[in-house]
A protein has these predicted regions:
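Alpha/beta-hydrolase superfamily serine-hydrolase fold, recognizing
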Residues: 2-335
Length: 335
């Protein structure tokens, strides 16, 4: 399959050719982009720039980590959904995917888009997980302020955020990841990983030789993110495996929904298949959809608008909200 749209300059290489996706134990979704998801059906209230943690950076500075919270303007306590933005582990902009977050909030959830440390902060995957867990704990401890049902929470991430969501969801009971946040409030009842990375050394496995060789021969920022700045992937296999969510798949893991576009030019769709198969082998409830023709989420807006529309179609977004209702409504307070 060859893709030749004009693409913007990006901090990661863009594939020219993509192998057909592995559909084992997965479902191929042939999505009509219309109708698009609904918006404006429920009045929302927002709480912006909510500080949930202050962290020390390697340069001696400190940084406040913040969340933007959306919820229906009712007095009802609702399950919490933490949204983790993507950004190639180079940036984390909590303002991303606003319409998607609005739709999910209108569907009956408290949706908090949260910041987490990334490579330019000197952050590693351990720091990202700690930050997300801090957001979970703080928001649930202040459930009264936001109308949160603290018994029910999910993680939902896109791209790099999908990686962090999966890793956080699978390590809630491990002391090395939880530290002083080892509490049930730091665990979740469901995880959504949308076109996320996993085993970073295999990020280009589905792509053309030029992109594969780039990752083999270049010490990228991904090496810094796994704690080995300046190293090639071939030099740090243990560190790469330690940062891979699939490493921590167990039978006690929460249910997972994984989604990936068949035409993803930035992250091989085999990355979510890798996590999906590890979860299934461990005996975990895992569902994976491959969206036919879809690109890398909002990246499609820049290069292929039709491919981007799949991610905001009623079909795909309804799969997300139905998954959340199925696993969070039963975990929370009677409604």
């Amino acid at each position: 399959m060859t893709h030749t749209p004009s693409v913007p300059r990006l901090p990661v290489p863009v594939a020219a050719t993509i192998a057909p996706p592995d559909l084992a134990d997965s479902t191929l979704l042939e999505v009509n982009p219309h109708p698009q998801m609904s918006l404006g059906t429920v009045e929302l209230e927002s709480h912006l720039d909510v500080t949930f943690s202050t962290v020390d950076l390697p340069n001696g500075a400190s940084r406040e980590l913040k969340a933007d919270v959306l919820r229906p303007a009712t007095g009802e306590r609702l399950p919490l959904v933490l949204f983790l933005p993507g950004g190639a582990f180079l940036r984390c902009n909590k303002a991303m995917a606003l319409d998607l977050r609005r739709h999910v909030a209108e569907s009956g959830f408290v949706v908090a888009s949260v910041e987490y440390r990334v490579a330019p902060d000197g952050g590693t995957y351990m720091d990202s997980v700690h930050d997300v867990r801090a957001a979970l704990v703080q928001l649930r401890q202040h459930a009264d302020d936001f109308g949160i049902d603290p018994r029910a929470a999910a993680l939902w991430g896109e791209s790099a955020g999908g990686h962090v969501a999966a890793l956080t969801g699978l390590t809630g009971e491990l002391p090395e990841f939880s530290g002083d946040l080892a509490t049930p409030l730091g665990t979740v009842q469901a995880v959504i990983d949308a076109f996320g990375t996993s085993l970073l050394s295999a990020i280009a496995d589905d792509f053309d030789e030029e992109v594969r060789l780039h990752y083999e021969r270049t010490a990228t920022h991904f090496s810094a993110y796994v704690g080995k700045a300046g190293a090639l992937f071939s030099e740090i296999p243990e560190a790469v495996v330690a940062a891979d969510p699939a490493t921590y798949a167990t039978a006690s893991a929460p249910p997972f929904l994984l989604l990936h576009g068949s035409a993803d030019m930035l992250v091989s769709s085999s990355q979510t298949q890798h996590v999906h198969q590890a979860l299934r082998t461990a005996g975990t409830d895992s569902t994976r959809y491959v969206v036919d023709g879809a690109n890398h989420g909002d990246f499609g807006v820049l290069a292929d608008s039709d491919a981007a529309l799949a991610w905001t179609s009623a079909t795909v977004v309804n799969d997300i909200t139905e998954f959340l209702h199925r696993h969070l409504d039963s975990a929370g307070l009677p409604r």
